[in-house]
A protein has these predicted regions:
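Helix-start (N-cap) detector for alpha-helical repeat units in TPR-like alpha-solenoids
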Residues: 701, 735-736, 769-777, 810-811, ...
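Structural marker of alpha-solenoid helical repeat scaffolds
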Residues: 730, 764-771, 805, 839, ...
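Primarily the internal scaffold of c-type cytochrome electron-transfer domains
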Residues: 124-128, 133, 153-198, 219, ...
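Structural signature of tandem alpha-helical TPR/SEL1-like repeats
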Residues: 714-726, 747-765, 774, 779, ...
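Membrane-embedded alpha-helical bundles that constitute the cytochrome b-like, heme-associated redox core
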Residues: 1-165, 174-175
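TPR/TPR-like (Sel1-like) alpha-helical repeat modules
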Residues: 844, 848-879
Length: 912
């Protein structure tokens, strides 16, 4: 009997120790989620101990349940529930849709364990020594407190690699100091690997495995048709450009592209050889694979150029194992405990700093190792967003959305899915919808093309045929003011283009390669075309070049010899002939000159369209079939220029995509508008000398405001002020109307008059919510009026009010720093400019004033560094003469360069 009792005691004691060990194991699993073999081993240990304790637990319950206190019985019920939920988790897994089950398992087992140990302590169970109860209490306390301490520590001391922080003191003075420098195998890309070594190709060829076993099939299908998938040599436009780059500029410089376009071949060293040798390999066709974004371990800063560090996950060899048993075991572990997998592929910046994460590849500059010239801005989508109202970080926007938005809010919207990672039946779309209609067209992906088309047409940009201007008479809005004209009249039609659902400039990206233009057509009552600007020179009206006299939204870059940069040869760009974009929440006013024919009838119909073609016609022809003109042998070509001519007769049988001929990418009408002009005879109406004929109500407040914004941005300050005065006449309580009048007067230099209207704006500001983002602009512009009059203290007071609301607005910070410098408070000025650099390390105004401030402080070492950075980022005036060559070579581009211009009809019978 004693022997049996002793065995039973040993049995219970061993099971109790196993229970305590399970508590500690659970505490570790709750505290960490490390993608390591040690953590994975603990997951298995958790299962083994848990299953192993079931027989002991069953025997204990059968013998002791009847004699237990109520607290003990409750504990048993909870632990039984925990066992059932644990076994269920082993079958269905703890993926996001089953998160509730995991949480339930944790809660019931935790509470049950606490109650059971309390029962043991209070009831003094006979088979447990008193010392064991103390150990149990300590174990329970450790198991409960340890995860809490770890969570608090991580919250207050986040891992430094996951913080996106711009340098202040270590900003590179040249591209040679960026990334890993010249010793990096990936230079001149700023991208690096965690070890500095190459990464096996197979790592980037496993995207399809992400769809296996029902994990992420929807994500994979979406990505498979996206522009990210076709970022590399499976994209003919990119392929031709890089081949040309390697031919003209050398192989090394093409790595500058590789960090964001070709990680599969750059990180394995293949890009050290001509791409023609490997163009059709799986690695060259991989694009931006799942692992390319999700294995990024660190985002270094927001200076772009692929400024990230990528890490080969420690468990990837197991995931990619050729052994089916090992892979099945790996897949089961991911399903059972996805946390290590999640930690490997989802970093905090993937969720919290999404815009900064996107900046790594959506902000670009070139420098000497790439362009054999100097620092030159490529595109800068990140800063456009950061300084705008859309981010709620910019103080000076004309309009603000109710809530701030990031890149993913528009480009990765929530869509229905049953993928393992879904939350309440939704996932972030991995189509990355943007504006690339060309790739889904040539790849024959109708779903992607439809998604992109719908995205473009979803009120992202709108147009408004707004005003009729006849000499000094303005009739607006045309549709509500019974706009009239007379036969023979020479009138101007103003069309307003407004950005609404765009979080960056419209357009954005490599805008020199796009065809985005406004088209205006006028027809008489018989349907005869009497005016047409912006047509396409082709029989079908589609497959041809756009009317060069049209109003374009693009940039026109020129090379060292003044040639147009038309082959995506950005390394040869030396200056910009013109660049026309519209910031978020802003507008552009486009002017057309129309002569009313004598025989046009009683009415003229105006139709305006904002057209979009992803790649311009010439670039598409060149990308697919461009070869050197055999008749043009006397040409010059070097790294900085190409004077050669091209013909489009090349072989297209091996081009990327499903279409093996020169394609005709679709033209999408982003927005359109229509209006009617009434044509009356001279003797049927009385002469009216009124300068402004309008019929407006509160609904037209925004239309007039947009009209004024467009005129203001062009520099038509008087016209803009007249429009804004109309705005405040319609709605005297519209604060922004007065602010916009002040903008015009400040630009004119009429600061005292601007001060008067800003006082009215200040009165209206008092009625706004303290968090209303529109408040700060009143303080900013009022500060400018005070600064111009030497009232620096008042100006500083208002600027600090603006910066308190918008601490990341560079313009506000720089104004504060400038005033502090003028007041000879140099150390304080340095502090302000450093705050600017925390947001944008390439801000030229900040570096200029830091140079001045350090000189004033006699800190020559820092002054020299600031001077180097200022000279690096400032515009190069020495290239200005090149623009003259480009302007003479292209008179249409020269006209587009003008801030204010009138567009004429391009049809032959009305060519003036």
């Amino acid at each position: 009997m004693r022997k049996e009792r002793f065995k039973l005691k040993i049995f219970y004691s061993a099971s109790f120790l196993g229970f305590l060990l399970l508590l500690l194991n659970s505490s570790y699993l709750a505290s960490f989620g490390t993608p390591s073999l040690f953590y994975i081993s603990n997951v298995f240990i958790h299962i083994l101990i848990g299953i192993g304790l079931i027989p002991f637990f069953t025997l204990f319950v059968s013998r002791s349940f009847a004699d237990m206190l109520h607290i003990g019985k409750i504990a048993i019920v909870l632990l039984i529930t925990g066992i059932i939920s644990g076994l269920w988790l082993m079958v269905v897994g703890a993926t996001t849709p089953n998160r509730w089950l995991l949480i339930s398992h944790i809660v019931v087992t935790t509470v049950g364990s606490i109650l059971l140990i309390l029962h043991f302590i209070w009831y003094r169970v006979s088979f447990i020594r008193h010392s064991f109860t103390k150990i149990a209490g300590v174990t329970l306390a450790v198991a409960l407190i340890f995860p809490v301490v770890v969570k608090i520590y991580r919250n207050y001391v986040p891992e430094s690699d996951y913080l996106v922080q711009n340098p202040i003191h270590d900003i590179p003075t040249s591209m040679y100091e960026e990334g890993g420098g010249t010793n990096s195998p990936f230079f001149p890309s700023s991208a690096e690997t965690a070890t500095g070594n190459l990464i096996p190709t197979d790592f980037f060829l496993t995207s399809k495995t992400c769809a296996e076993k029902g994990c992420h099939p929807d994500v994979y299908r979406q990505w498979n048709e996206s522009a990210h998938h076709f970022s590399s040599f499976n994209n003919q436009w990119y392929r031709k450009s890089v081949m040309y780059m390697q031919d003209v500029n050398g192989i090394q410089s093409s790595k500058w592209c590789g960090g964001c376009h070709d990680p599969a071949i750059m990180f394995n060293g293949i890009m050290d050889r001509p791409i023609r040798e490997n163009m059709h390999t799986p690695a060259a066709q991989a694009g931006l694979a799942c692992t390319a974004c999700h294995s990024i371990e660190r985002v270094k800063d927001t200076m772009g150029n692929g400024g990230y560090t990528i890490k080969y996950p420690p468990l990837h060899d197991i995931a990619a194992s050729q052994n089916k048993v090992v892979r099945k075991l790996h897949n089961y572990i991911i399903q059972l405990d996805p946390e290590p997998h999640r930690r490997s592929f989802i970093k905090p910046f993937h969720r919290e700093n999404t815009a900064e994460f996107c900046s790594t590849c959506h902000k670009v500059h070139l420098d000497k190792p790439v362009n054999n010239f100097r620092w030159f801005r490529g595109f800068n989508t990140y800063d456009q967003w950061q300084t705008s109202g859309v981010s709620h970080q910019g103080a000076l926007s004309f309009y603000y959305p109710d809530e701030p938005k990031k890149c993913v809010d528009c480009h990765m919207p929530l869509v229905p899915s049953k993928d393992a990672g879904n939350k309440r039946g939704k996932i972030k779309s991995h189509r990355f919808v943007g504006a690339n209609t060309a790739l889904p067209y040539v790849n024959k992906h109708p779903d992607q093309l439809e998604a992109v088309t719908n995205f473009l047409q979803d009120d992202k940009v709108t147009i408004d045929i707004f005003a009729l201007v006849n000499e000094n008479k303005i009739t607006a809005p045309i549709g509500q003011s019974n706009a009239k004209a007379f036969p023979g009249d020479d009138v101007r039609v103003d069309v307003v283009v407004r950005t609404r659902g765009v979080g960056h400039h419209f357009p954005a990206g490599t805008i020199d390669a796009f065809d985005i233009w406004l088209e205006l057509k006028a027809t008489d009552e018989d349907g005869k075309i009497i005016f047409w600007n912006g047509m396409i020179d082709a029989k079908d009206g589609k497959n041809g070049q756009v009317d060069p006299n049209a109003h374009f939204y693009k940039s026109h870059l020129i090379d060292e010899h003044g040639n147009h940069i038309n082959k995506r040869n950005a390394w040869a760009a030396r200056t910009i002939l013109y660049s026309r974009t519209i910031p978020p929440g802003a507008a552009d006013t486009v002017r057309y000159r129309l002569i009313i024919p004598e025989d046009c009838g009683k009415r003229i119909t105006l139709q305006a369209k904002l057209n979009y073609r992803k790649f311009n016609w010439w670039l598409t022809q060149w990308s697919y079939a461009g070869v050197r003109d055999p008749d043009h042998t006397d040409f010059q070509v070097d790294k900085g220029y190409d004077n050669g001519k091209w013909v489009f007769t090349g072989d297209t049988s091996q081009v990327a995509g499903e279409i093996k001929e020169i394609p005709n990418p679709p033209i999408v009408v982003i927005s359109e508008d229509q209006a009617t002009l009434e044509i009356v005879q001279t003797d049927s109406v009385s002469t009216d000398s009124t300068e402004l004929k309008t019929k407006s109500d509160v609904r037209d407040q925004e239309r007039w405001n947009d009209y004024g914004i467009g005129l203001l941005r062009q520099g038509d300050l008087k016209g803009a002020e007249a429009a804004f005065l109309k705005v405040v006449k319609i709605n005297p309580n519209y604060m922004d109307g007065y602010v916009n009048i002040a903008r015009c007067r400040i630009k004119e230099g009429n600061h005292s008059s601007a001060e008067e209207v800003l006082k009215k704006a200040e009165e209206l500001k008092q009625h706004l919510d303290p968090k209303d983002p529109n408040r700060a602009k009143v303080d900013y512009f009022y500060a400018l009026t005070q600064k111009s009059q030497g009232r620096y203290d008042v100006a500083l007071k208002h600027l600090r009010m603006a910066s308190e609301q918008f601490p990341r607005d560079k313009r506000v910070r720089n104004e504060i720093g400038r005033l502090l410098y003028l007041e000879r408070r140099y150390a304080e000025a340095v502090t302000e400019f450093q705050k600017t650099l925390e947001v944008d390390p390439e801000d030229v105004d900040a570096h200029y004033h830091l140079m001045l401030s350090y000189h004033a402080l006699k800190d020559q070492l820092k002054a020299v560094k600031a001077q180097k950075l200022y000279l690096r980022f400032k515009l190069d005036e020495s290239v200005d003469p090149i623009t003259g060559i480009g302007r003479r070579a292209n008179p249409y581009a020269n006209m587009e360069r003008q801030k204010i211009r009138e567009h004429l009809s391009s049809i032959a019978s009305y060519q003036y």
